[in-house]
């Protein structure tokens, strides 16, 4: 059974995308099509902030792209040596909060110790931070242009200072239409389509509706989390599956249940 995932491929240590591998364990043939591209912004300013950990109570990373922005800052400004020598240790003396295991893995690669990765989404991370944070200094939050206000609002309501800096913007992947056309012409209508963000839904839904035609009612739509599920529902699409956590294992389990007769998760 063929399933379509609207995300870019990420190879793990085994040289395979973990989503393809996990779905394959259930006999599902997954194809990945990227729908988003990212452009980095304000890196000199972000680099300067990373150079002054004494000004902040800690860091918040809620997306892999924000971590990539930090990596670029270190590479482009010849800060790798000073990062390894002193900055990394100073940041590790503070809290580094993250959402999800994928983001946590990237943060650990630049030498930072993380906490909160099991929270899974911004709402739960906000609760976690509020239960622990006592520093009078602001938390530094590198984010994208489409960031939601749940985390900033929750922290503000609890009197926890936070300083946001937009370090990337989300744009449509230039190959969306062509890649979807190729997929449908070669594979036909998939049994399931998974969306990984509201913006990914925005950029791809029209093409999917046109290509699926009357067969769109046969597709089981899945979401990686509650925010994306709400975006699907707002477009009038039935959500057959919302992953219990943003992991390949949880999504594969959910899709398998949704594709079983009368299945729903």
From Swiss-Prot:
Optimum pH is 8.2. Pathway: Porphyrin-containing compound metabolism; protoporphyrin-IX biosynthesis; coproporphyrinogen-III from 5-aminolevulinate: step 3/4. The keyword Transmembrane does not apply. Changing residue 53 to L: In CEP; severe phenotype; no detectable activity. Changing residue 212 to P: In CEP; no residual activity. Changing residue 188 to R: In CEP; less than 5% wild-type activity. It catalyses: hydroxymethylbilane = uroporphyrinogen III + H2O. It is found in: Cytoplasm, Cytosol. It is linked to Congenital erythropoietic porphyria: Porphyrias are inherited defects in the biosynthesis of heme, resulting in the accumulation and increased excretion of porphyrins or porphyrin precursors. They are classified as erythropoietic or hepatic, depending on whether the enzyme deficiency occurs in red blood cells or in the liver. The manifestations of CEP are heterogeneous, ranging from nonimmune hydrops fetalis due to severe hemolytic anemia in utero to milder, later onset forms, which have only skin lesions due to cutaneous photosensitivity in adult life. This is Uroporphyrinogen-III synthase. The gene is Mgu.
